[in-house]
């Protein structure tokens, strides 16, 4: 993994479990969000199995949450609760319907200390089509996009910052 914006380079060995109710697109959006924010202490949580936790977070030894990352289209109430519990909150939406979600919640999100990004939904689908049970992939992040190369193909996934704090 190479993040040219942050000068962050790492070889990550990740095991990602797909929840039975989780789409492949969501799982891959979650992987992208992880890579975009990769740093020491960043871990996947129980995800959809635990509504009290985000998809990804950083917690300190005293169990304080310094970074809370949700993937999808969480309700404004969930984001508000997260912003009270964590030092920094980020949301990555990825669905084709995320435009509607953003327009409906925009005014409520505007008053919260949260950064919101929207992945290009078609690019996420293209990335999902490359998934294999066991795979090696290379991710290079520059600006607001990630170039992904796998044994079965390559693609680029871009994202748009909707609100950055």
Predicted regions and their residues:
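Conserved catalytic cores of phosphodiester-cleaving nucleases, focusing on short active-site segments
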Residues: 56-58, 65-79
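A short acidic, amphipathic alpha-helical/loop segment
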Residues: 78-82, 104-105
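Helix-rich interaction surfaces within compact, conserved domain-sized segments
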Residues: 1-19, 90, 98-160, 165
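Mid-length scaffold segments of soluble, non-membrane domains
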Residues: 81-95
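Acidic-basic catalytic patches of nuclease active cores, encompassing PD-(D/E)XK
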Residues: 3-48
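Catalytic beta/alpha-barrel core
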Residues: 68-72, 91-93, 118
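Long amphipathic N-terminal alpha/beta scaffold segment
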Residues: 46-52, 57-61
């Amino acid at each position: 993994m190479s993040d040219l914006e942050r000068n962050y380079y790492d070889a990550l060995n990740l095991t990602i479990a797909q929840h039975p109710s989780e789409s492949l697109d969501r799982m891959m959006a979650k992987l992208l969000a992880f890579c975009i924010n990769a740093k020491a202490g960043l871990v996947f949580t129980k995800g959809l199995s635990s509504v009290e936790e985000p998809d990804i977070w950083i917690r300190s030894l005293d169990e304080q949450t310094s970074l809370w990352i949700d993937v999808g289209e969480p309700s404004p109430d969930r984001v508000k609760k997260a912003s009270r519990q964590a030092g920094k909150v980020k949301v990555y939406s990825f669905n084709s319907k995320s435009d509607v979600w953003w327009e409906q919640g925009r005014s409520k999100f505007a008053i919260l200390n949260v950064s919101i990004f929207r992945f290009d939904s078609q690019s996420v689908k293209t990335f999902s089509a490359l998934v294999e049970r066991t795979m090696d992939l290379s991710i290079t992040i520059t600006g607001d996009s990630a170039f992904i190369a796998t044994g079965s193909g390559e693609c680029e996934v871009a994202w748009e910052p909707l609100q950055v704090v």
